[in-house]
Structure formats: C-alpha cells, structure tokens
C-alpha cells in the first residue's frame, strides 16, 4: 500500500548549500522531517549544478515523516541575469535597458529549461524566455 502524502513543500534553495537555517529548517521542521537528512541528500543531488544557483525543489512529506523530493532547473530569470552579467532586472523595463542577451544564449537557456517547461517545441520555449528577458529590461539580439 502506498504511503499517504501529508504535505508538499515548495522551496528555492541554493544548489549545494542547503543547511538547517531558514528557509529550509522551519519549513521541514513543522512537518517533522529530518532536516539534516534532507540537506545532505539535496546537496548530493545538486553537486552537478553551479554552486549557489537558486534551485526550486518540491518535497513530498509522507505520514511516517519520510520524504522524497524533486529538483527542478533554476528559474529563467536567474539564468538570464547570469547570461547578461547583471545583478538585477530593470525597474522600468520599457525605458531602461540593463543588458543584452543573444539568441544563442536564449537557445542554451531554453535547452536547459526544456525538462521543466511545458512548451510545445524549442522555438516556443525560446519565445517565452525572450519575453521574460524583455520584461526584465534586457535587449534580445538576433
């Protein structure tokens, strides 16, 4: 018989840097999950991801206080800021441009995000990511 899911917890945790401090500790502690066990498993699973990159994770907590988790790809906005070399997007994206991204960089981000995005094809994903870039005040070249 399958275990009963008690809760789903959605967090963004820096890859390879999960520790019991907030936001991880309190979110897991209130459901009675072994926090250090999660931190060790998460850090091991995100070894291949660039250290410190915010990584979304969905944790399923079961009635016996065990858990499983799924890591997702970093948010498109984070990948775009990294590609453009800027710290943050523009406060006024239509008038103040803060950086540029090329079509090849958008292609690379779309391929990275392909597993998580529900776009029909890679071109649709590229258009979606280009729209995100424009809404952040980035100029899309190409």
From Swiss-Prot:
It comes from Aliivibrio salmonicida (strain LFI1238). Keywords: Methylation, Ribonucleoprotein, Ribosomal protein, RNA-binding, rRNA-binding. One or more lysine residues are methylated. GO terms for molecular function: large ribosomal subunit rRNA binding; structural constituent of ribosome. Residues 84-103 are annotated as: Disordered. The keyword Hydrolase does not apply. Signal peptide: none annotated. Part of the ribosomal stalk of the 50S ribosomal subunit. Interacts with L10 and the large rRNA to form the base of the stalk. L10 forms an elongated spine to which L12 dimers bind in a sequential fashion forming a multimeric L10(L12)X complex. The keyword rRNA-binding applies. GO terms for cellular component: cytosolic large ribosomal subunit. This is Large ribosomal subunit protein uL11. Belongs to the universal ribosomal protein uL11 family. Forms part of the ribosomal stalk which helps the ribosome interact with GTP-bound translation factors. Coiled coil: none annotated.
